[in-house]
């Protein structure tokens, strides 16, 4: 089944992008997972990432790695829903937690940001160390989509690590996305949601690593947070240096791994014209439904899974391509 099959049509009562984005986080459905194996991956002398594995029971099962968005973790409903559907389809599924996220709170001396492609590489290498004869497919959601695309552009000479990649609603221009979230009326609703999660992560960091640079807890917006914590903690000269070096738009031209970008034209955080204004390699397939919001994609029709979660369906469908 091709990725273009079952084109997205929004639910008739959830038409606009903000509603799609909000409702995409509601009606969570069954997110109960079978037993998971936990891995703690050391990424530096004071930092560990928590990685969960859903075993398929099939030694020949293909591997899919899922990476969450900002404010999320392996426990986010969309990660668990998609992981379960992939597992039912027979995949071996890994769900990573970035620094300071989920069960990884307090296990790293600084929090993750939109440019931690080195961490993603270490997770990929760890998984392939467990299963050296297998290939891996990687799905990055939202901010992890930016990280994934950055990684692929940086590692253009190492395509054998990843068979293919999918970035879902990636904010490839971090500065622009930050300004939208921090400065616009439509963005502030979501900004406040993200900041609550970030402040919890910051408190866990300060409690576990006294004396290290930690968020003050007074940051009101994503932009404030990036200025006062993200950039200095990651040793960038300033926030513009962080945005410039970590925005995936600067790496798309160098990607050699077959890559799909799924991003709705009405995404409230990721402006659609950004993809037309940057150079993209021929390895990238851009899939841009007219509607869907930011990781919403609540469909008007039932998917083959019996729900209205078009994003879930597309990720699982994409994972199964070339394997039938």
Located regions from the model:
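N-terminal cap/lid segment of alpha/beta-hydrolase-fold proteins
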Residues: 17-58
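Short amphipathic alpha-helix adjacent to the substrate-entry channel of hydrolases
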Residues: 78-95
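Alpha/beta-hydrolase-fold enzymes
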Residues: 129-133, 137-233
């Amino acid at each position: 089944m091709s990725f273009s099959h079952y084109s997205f049509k929004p639910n008739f009562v959830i038409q606009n992008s903000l509603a799609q984005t909000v409702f995409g986080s509601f009606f969570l459905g069954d997110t109960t997972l079978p037993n998971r194996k936990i891995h703690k991956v050391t990424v530096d002398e004071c930092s560990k990432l928590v990685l969960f594995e859903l075993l398929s029971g099939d030694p020949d099962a293909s591997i899919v790695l899922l990476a969450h968005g900002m404010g999320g973790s392996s426990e986010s409903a969309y990660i668990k829903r998609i992981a379960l559907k992939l597992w039912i389809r027979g995949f071996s599924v890994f769900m990573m937690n970035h620094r300071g996220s989920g069960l990884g709170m307090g296990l790293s001396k600084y929090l993750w940001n939109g440019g931690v492609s080195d961490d993603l590489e270490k997770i990929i290498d760890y998984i392939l160390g467990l299963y050296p004869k297998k290939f891996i497919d990687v799905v990055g959601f939202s901010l992890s989509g930016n990280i994934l695309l950055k990684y692929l552009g940086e590692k253009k000479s190492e395509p054998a690590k990843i068979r293919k990649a999918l970035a879902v609603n990636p904010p490839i221009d971090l500065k622009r996305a930050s300004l939208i979230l921090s400065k616009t009326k439509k963005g502030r609703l979501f900004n406040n949601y993200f900041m609550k999660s970030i402040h919890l992560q910051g408190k866990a960091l300060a409690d576990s690593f006294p004396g290290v640079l930690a968020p003050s807890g007074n940051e009101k917006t994503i932009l404030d947070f990036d200025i006062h914590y993200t950039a200095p903690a990651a040793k960038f000269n300033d926030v513009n240096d962080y945005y410039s070096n970590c925005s995936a738009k600067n790496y798309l031209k160098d990607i050699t791994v077959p890559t799909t970008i799924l991003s709705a034209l009405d995404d409230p955080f990721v402006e659609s014209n950004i993809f037309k204004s940057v150079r993209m390699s021929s390895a990238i397939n851009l899939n841009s439904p007219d509607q869907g919001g930011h990781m919403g994609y609540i469909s008007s029709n039932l998917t083959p899974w019996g729900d209205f979660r078009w994003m879930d369906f597309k990720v699982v469908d994409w994972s199964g391509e070339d394997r039938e």
